[in-house]
Regions:
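Long, polar/Ser/Thr-enriched low-complexity segments
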Residues: 1-105, 225, 229-235
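Charged linear interaction tracts used for macromolecular binding and regulation
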Residues: 65-232
Length: 235
């Protein structure tokens, strides 16, 4: 059941179907607060847009019957959006890109093994629904390059560590790292958790077309989702 009939709109909430009256357009001029809120939500929506397919699956555990993408937007708007002097930013320590009730790791960290490689480590204890076979999801975010975000499922909980080759376009400024786990048994996901960050000390202006070309090649070779390429092209 969906669609419109006159001034009625068919809706769905938590698998419950109902009708509501179509909202009237307000002719009042929005307040400064309303304008700021809309811009902030637009910022978060633009940030997450390339991750739509990923979030539909990995964030669906936030609320039963809800759309993972539609849940991730208000969550990160409320918990991770930062208002700055010239616009908005994201607190990647508070942001979440996966959400579910599968247990995460008690500890997680990241160090730079060499100029091209990250070493992500995590504790391997298991409890409740967790299992040694749970797959690891890593998420990298580079604010210096228009909030470029890359992600991939690689490794498992029992490994305790994973080396990740840094995408060429992401060795600028500060690189934030999160991890999450995905169950092979019941497809549940854990909340993504902050592992740390690496400061490369190079500004975004250091990026070149060469870096963009290398990034495209990296994505094609590694199988990383198109989110990485799309975000590079946003610049």
């Amino acid at each position: 059941l969906k669609g419109k009939m006159g001034n009625l709109v068919a809706c769905n909430w938590r698998d419950i179907y109902y009708l509501r009256v179509k909202a009237k357009r307000s002719k009042k001029k929005p307040t400064k607060t309303q304008v700021s809120n809309r811009r902030g939500f637009g910022f978060v929506s633009t940030l997450l847009a390339p991750l739509r397919q990923f979030l539909l699956i990995q964030f669906k555990g936030y609320e039963r019957g809800s759309d993972g993408m539609l849940s991730a937007q208000p969550y990160n708007y409320t918990n991770a959006l930062i208002k700055t002097a010239d616009g908005f930013d994201i607190d990647y320590r508070a942001a979440r890109f996966c959400y579910g009730d599968l247990p995460g790791a008690q500890k997680a960290s990241v160090v730079l093994k060499d100029e091209n490689t990250l070493l992500i480590t995590w504790s391997t204890e298991i409890k409740d629904l967790a299992d040694h076979s749970d797959l690891l999801i890593w998420i990298l975010a580079c604010p210096a390059w228009n909030h470029l975000i890359a992600h991939e499922i690689q490794g498992s909980r029992k490994d305790g560590q994973l080396e990740v080759t840094i995408p060429p376009a992401m060795n600028l400024g500060v690189l934030h790292v999160q991890i999450a786990f995905k169950s092979l048994v019941n497809e549940k996901t854990s909340k993504s958790q902050y592992a740390g960050c690496i400061d490369f000390g190079r500004p975004a202006e250091a990026a070149t077309t060469y870096a963009e070309d290398r990034t495209t090649a990296f994505c094609q070779a590694s199988g990383i989702s198109g989110a990485l390429i799309k975000r590079v092209n946003l610049r």
